[in-house]
């Protein structure tokens, strides 16, 4: 591994413990000076010599609200990526903004293992990774006005009628995000699902000064999520937007509005299940039998940002 160049964002204290087996370096990275790719696009960051690897996994979140300076061993702004999947967008932000702390979460342990491995090998000590859903995280572990940004890319639309309640972007969730953000804090949303986006455009501006974005994010293409890469390759339109928390909305008013707004009961477009299959590495033809409305198992996807696909 000595041929790998040291990254400028080195951890303050190199990890002394022997890494677990799942952190094995790929043959591709060995041949390409520490650079890995996915669908031909480099994964953000460069794999360092083992002595510079970080420890970023959270086996369990502490009870109650997270003490951010204690968790990251420094005091800095916090960005949360809910449903981070295998970590591409979080890694890109962590590489580009070493002065910012990043927490990536997902309900699937397997994708968090991928994200953790990549962050560890790149020495990104400004990241932490945890297996937890978005609602639970914000409700139980994030203190009011303690986070600078909350990102959610490609939330899972859930196709069955009895799964509507699992959809992440809802008035309740948006109220929790609004409460968690510091004054001037930012929400970032992205999806390839037109009906989901139309719903977001109706409810998100109630809590945020929200604007649509037509162009890719500045971190593209390296910072593109796995879902975004696949959807774009299939010609799907990607819907993006961001906004600041409304300063004229207090907690009680936000709670009242959340209770009065419509739930995300839109009719999900099942044609996008073919993209879901590609995201899982399957052939779309294998999903033809799902025309009866059955969806894949809840959360069974490459990487839910909470209840999401990344």
Q: Where are each of the predicted segments found?
A:
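Conserved SAM/SAH-binding beta-strand->alpha-helix loop
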Residues: 108
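SAM/dcSAM-binding transferase cores
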Residues: 2-11, 18-74, 214-310
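A short glycine-rich, Lys/Arg-flanked "PGG" loop and its adjoining helix->strand segment in the class I
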Residues: 169-183
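Conserved beta-strand signature within the Rossmann-like core of class I S-adenosyl-L-methionine
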Residues: 184-191
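Class I SAM-dependent methyltransferase "Motif I" SAM/SAH-binding loop
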Residues: 83-87
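Conserved SAM-binding loop
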Residues: 115
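S-adenosyl-L-methionine
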Residues: 119-143
């Amino acid at each position: 591994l000595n041929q790998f160049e040291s990254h400028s964002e080195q951890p303050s204290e190199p990890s002394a413990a022997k890494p677990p087996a799942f952190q094995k370096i790929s043959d591709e990275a060995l041949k390409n000076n520490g650079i890995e790719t996915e669908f031909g696009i480099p994964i953000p960051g460069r794999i360092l010599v083992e002595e510079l690897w970080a420890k970023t996994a959270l086996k369990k979140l502490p009870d109650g609200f997270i003490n951010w300076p204690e968790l990251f061993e420094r005091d800095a702004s916090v960005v949360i990526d809910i449903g981070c999947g295998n970590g591409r967008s979080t890694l890109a932000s962590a590489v580009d903004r070493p002065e910012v702390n990043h927490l990536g979460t997902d309900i699937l342990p397997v994708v968090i293992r991928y994200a953790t491995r990549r962050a560890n090998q790149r020495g990104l000590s400004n990241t932490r990774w945890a297996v937890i859903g978005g609602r639970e995280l914000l409700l139980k572990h994030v203190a009011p006005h303690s986070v600078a940004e909350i990102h959610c890319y490609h939330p899972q639309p859930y196709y069955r009628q009895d799964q509507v309640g699992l959809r992440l972007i809802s008035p309740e969730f948006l109220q929790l995000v609004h409460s968690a953000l510091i004054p001037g804090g930012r929400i970032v949303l992205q999806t390839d699902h037109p009906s989901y986006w139309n719903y977001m455009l109706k409810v998100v501006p109630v809590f945020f000064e929200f604007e649509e974005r037509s162009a890719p994010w500045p971190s593209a293409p390296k910072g593109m999520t796995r879902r975004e890469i696949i959807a774009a390759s299939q010609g799907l339109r990607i819907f993006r937007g961001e906004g600041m928390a409304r300063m004229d909305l207090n907690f009680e008013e936000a709670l009242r509005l959340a209770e009065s707004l419509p739930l995300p009961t839109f009719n999900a477009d099942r044609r996008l299940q073919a993209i879901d299959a590609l995201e899982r590495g399957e052939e779309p033809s294998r999903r033809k039998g799902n025309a009866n409305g059955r969806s894949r198992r809840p959360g069974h996807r490459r990487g839910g940002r909470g209840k999401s696909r990344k």
